[in-house]
């Protein structure tokens, strides 16, 4: 998924300096051991040599973390929230955490039937009011679920059926897209398995006239290699692109606007190098560090190497779809799949942005963009490059 901005102006990042191995190693340096004074309920992390340490580790969920989303508070960023999925066939949940990693039990939603991925968006008109939303895929029910933020109240009348009349229905990945021209909000949904073409289905989210959110199918699109599966989906709202990980093949790029010229044509495939010089096995979670000038970085999880590989958001001057690899960062998350990032300054712990990644020990890890960027990537607090 990719973080949405309340104003509709994206955070993006501008690449200034080239990749330097010496700087990279320095940027990735971390203490040999994690803090030993973790509070009860917070899982310890064994930090590999040369890997980044998280600033915050959340309290443990009950079963199996998978995907986070970041909601930015409209007036006080320090009150922003992290929504994260906990997969279980019968007792899954959407957990809500504060910026200290503490579970907010009054906002956490359960039981859900294997809720897989989640995303947030701002300003959906429901019942005549502008409502921020969190939308998750409930795989066991073949539905997507819609909740208002920050209270996490159900506003979907029990869920929205997806992939109806298909044999392969089980939803997995999701990303929300807000069209800049008119504010229309869409859900782009992937599934556990699907066809070679039309793997993703896109739904327009709207009020049914009674205060419930419904989804209207507007298109089916997206190529699939058949090598593994497609889970991670991320939308760049201001630039109008959707990216998804065709695992074992690469990251595919399309127009997010279903009405755009050539909307069904693949624009690029990148992050497609595997082996010693690329991904260890599968390309997984995607997140986009956005700066307001349209530049930035696309982070892709190299899950089995416990690394994130970073690419330019804006491409090249003569080819905006040429997303160049610029850096690889080792992290202390284990087998990380879903992730999210923002350049909004939520508090002093994250002076140029917050990166959240799941770890397979039932936790989510919060990293500072300062640590990821080091000295060789651009830092843009609140989406603005500092002179």
Annotate each PLM feature.
Residues 64-78, 117-129, 170-183, 231-240, ...:
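Structural signature of eukaryotic scaffold interfaces centered on beta-propeller domains
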Residues 278-325:
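Loop/turn-rich, solvent-exposed surfaces of beta-rich toroidal or solenoidal domains
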Residues 55-92:
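Beta-strand-rich domains and repeat architectures in extracellular enzymes and scaffolds
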Residues 24-27:
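C-terminal motif of bacterial Sec signal peptides marking the signal peptidase cleavage site
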Residues 140-185, 190-191:
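Asp-box/WD-like beta-propeller blade repeats and closely related beta-sheet repeat scaffolds
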């Amino acid at each position: 998924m990719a973080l949405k901005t309340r104003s509709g102006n994206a955070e993006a990042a501008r690449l200034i300096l080239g990749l330097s191995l010496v700087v990279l190693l320095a940027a990735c340096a971390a203490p040999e051991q994690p803090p030993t004074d973790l509070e009860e309920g917070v899982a310890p992390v064994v930090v590999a040599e040369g890997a980044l340490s998280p600033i915050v580790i959340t309290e443990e969920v009950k079963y199996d973390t998978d995907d986070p989303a970041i909601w930015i508070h409209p007036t006080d960023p320090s009150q922003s929230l992290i929504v994260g999925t906990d997969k279980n066939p019968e007792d899954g949940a959407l957990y809500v955490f504060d910026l200290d990693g503490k579970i907010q039990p009054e906002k956490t939603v359960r039981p859900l039937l294997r809720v897989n991925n989640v995303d947030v968006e701002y300003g959906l008109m429901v019942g005549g009011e502008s409502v921020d939303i969190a939308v998750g895929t409930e795989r066991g029910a073949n539905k997507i679920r819609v909740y208002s933020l920050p209270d996490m109240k159900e506003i979907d009348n029990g869920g929205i059926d997806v992939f109806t009349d298909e044999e392969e229905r089980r939803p997995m990945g999701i990303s929300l897209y807000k069209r800049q021209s008119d504010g229309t909000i869409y859900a782009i949904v992937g599934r556990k398995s699907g066809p070679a073409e039309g793997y993703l289905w896109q739904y327009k989210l709207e009020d049914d006239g009674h205060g419930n959110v419904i989804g209207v199918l507007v298109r089916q699109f997206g190529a699939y290699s058949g090598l593994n599966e497609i889970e991670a989906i991320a939308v760049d709202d201001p630039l109008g692109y959707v990216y998804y990980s065709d695992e074992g093949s690469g990251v595919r790029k399309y127009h997010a606007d279903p009405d755009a010229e050539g909307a069904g044509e693949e624009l690029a495939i990148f992050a497609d190098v595997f082996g010693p010089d690329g991904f260890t096995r599968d390309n997984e979670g995607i997140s986009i560090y956005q700066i307001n000038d349209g530049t930035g970085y696309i982070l892709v999880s190299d899950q089995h190497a416990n690394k994130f590989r970073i690419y330019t958001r804006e491409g090249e001057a003569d080819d905006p779809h040429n997303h160049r690899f610029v850096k690889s960062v080792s992290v202390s998350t284990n087998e990380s799949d879903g992730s999210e990032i923002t350049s909004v300054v939520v508090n002093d712990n994250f002076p140029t942005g917050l990166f959240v990644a799941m770890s397979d020990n039932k936790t989510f890890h919060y990293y500072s963009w300062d640590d990821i960027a080091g000295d060789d990537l651009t830092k843009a607090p609140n989406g603005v490059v500092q002179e």
